[in-house]
């Protein structure tokens, strides 16, 4: 299994729609000034989060149960900057829509800009033939409020291609998050 380069990412996105919308290079500035970088890097793709957030709250004194998740545990928020309360988390989604090839497994890692501020990004692997917008989880590990900037870089996707095609892909299994759009809560 080998990691794929910027040339491969560019070709797969421009010719096969692997990432849409796609940024062929690194963007570090916008009309608003400096931004946290996004777009194609040497061996990965830095994704942006949209301006759609679900901020965790415990006003209902609920128990977090992944098999019976209560949507009321979140406050919906739309805006350019999301403020995550201390020791809490928020969900968001990527601006980009992904179509992962059958021979590829994609791993997501947080950007150092956020990690150095105590903000951790968590995403499970994007499996072969999965497609959709990626739901992102931001954990604020600090005891201070933390900011997440919409439409700026938040995490990096790394693409690994196997030397052998898998027998059963995510699509073949009818995975429950296939084709997801928007911020998607846990499903069982």
From Swiss-Prot:
It catalyses: dCTP + H2O + H(+) = dUTP + NH4(+). Pfam families: DCD (PF22769). Transmembrane segments: none annotated. InterPro entries: dCTP_deaminase (IPR011962), dUTPase-like_sf (IPR036157), dUTPase_trimeric (IPR033704). Its EC number is 3.5.4.13. Keywords: Hydrolase, Nucleotide metabolism, Nucleotide-binding. The active site is at residue 137. DCTP binds at residues 111-116, 135-137, 156, 170, 180. It comes from the Bacteria. GO terms for biological process: dUMP biosynthetic process; dUTP biosynthetic process; nucleobase-containing small molecule interconversion. Pathway: Pyrimidine metabolism; dUMP biosynthesis; dUMP from dCTP (dUTP route): step 1/2. One of its GO terms (molecular function) is nucleotide binding. Belongs to the dCTP deaminase family. NCBIfam families: dCTP_deam. Homotrimer. Catalyzes the deamination of dCTP to dUTP. HAMAP family: dCTP_deaminase. This is dCTP deaminase. The lineage of its organism: Bacteria, Pseudomonadati, Pseudomonadota, Gammaproteobacteria, Pseudomonadales.
